[in-house]
Amino acid sequence: MTHSHSHSPASGPAPLGPIAAKIVVGLLAAIGVLVVIGAALLWPAQQKVEIPLPYQNSSGSAVTTEAGHVVSTRAAVCGDQSVGKVLTSEPARVQGDEGCVQSQIAIDSGPNQGAYTLVEFSGGPGQPNLAVGEHVRITRQIDPTGTTTYAFYDYERTWSLAALAAVFAVVVVAVARWRGLRALLGIVVAFVVLVVFLLPALRDGASAVPVSLVASAIILYAVIYLAHGVSLRTSAALLGTLTSLLLAAFLSWAAIELTHLTGLSQEDNNAVAAYLGNVSITGLLLAGFIIGSLGVLNDVTITQASAVFELAEHGGSRRSIFVGAMRVGSDHIASTVYTLVLAYAGSALPLLLLFSVAGRGLGDVLTVRTWPSRSPARRSAASHWRYRCR
């Protein structure tokens, strides 16, 4: 099976006739104007939103996190009164049944830098297992009496994630050179659009479909031209991607309506429903489907555009070009399908494991509402929220 990934639409002459070229450029210009108008109309009002309860401190403001590292870890009696307090030395050991695990954390930032605090865990499955020297993040809260308390928040991952991102960037640039660097810039642009436009607009209660379509179009215009250069070949690929995006949005809406998906089977969506009442959960689910389809659509349309233009440059009738392009496309679609399905199944392995021990039939597994709306990104977000709310 030949899975073509010749993503180089900017190279070579463009075998488009003058009329076809004018149509492509004209349509992209018109769509671009509509996207700009849509962004202006849907631009978020930056309304102040109350911080969700799990992320509030006792005064209702955002929880502050500080850096720390583990000094010692030991088995201890549960319910030690020193847990969470600011300490200047190691607390005395309490005698009794040592059913918990306590870790002394040195505070490395904030107003109590240089002091210590004590965190406690039950030691059960899923609880952190802190080793001496490990760097962590701890929350700092001040209660109404002015007393400062600390609690374990998460592992410190800044440097490890930065190192992985740096390795990824180096490999991309080393292999793809300037095109790889431009692709990385496209990723930055995509995240800026999501953070500056999409998320605030959804938070303001704007309709999910137009917001996600406008955001997706902005991302596509930026990343495709950045990564592949400005040419008629790239423009043809962009027009195909935008057309496919509309179809994907319609199919996503139809799937949600026909299968009666609500999104409320996932804890992150339930949290949004509880704390952001003006946000439509079904709309949020639909927006996730639309944004999630961008990568696949971009991959397929760019590859197909490259294949068609390469075939056209070598001559041949329109029929032979069409047949050859469809042959490449069928291989590409086939490999993309099982790639998506395997990624989908891999992200839902815990859910599949639970279904396997529950004695549920295959029909129940495939149609239960917690399964169709499952995706890697959404599962990760749900896991993150559950961990925070423990």
Where are these regions (language model features)?
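Transmembrane alpha-helical segments that form the functional core of multipass membrane systems
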Residues: 166-171, 178-271, 279-292
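Short, glycine/charged-enriched hinge/interface segments at domain edges or termini
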Residues: 147-183
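Hydrophobic alpha-helical transmembrane segments
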Residues: 100-113, 134, 155-164, 183-193, ...
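Hydrophobic secretory-pathway targeting helix
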Residues: 1-63
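Alpha-helical transmembrane segments and their helix-start/interface "positive-inside/aromatic belt" motifs
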Residues: 18-28, 232-245, 335-339
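Extracytoplasmic/periplasmic regions of membrane proteins
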Residues: 47-159
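Generic detector of multi-pass transmembrane helix bundles and their immediately adjacent loops
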Residues: 249, 253-383
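Alpha-helical transmembrane anchor segments
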Residues: 221-223, 378, 382-390
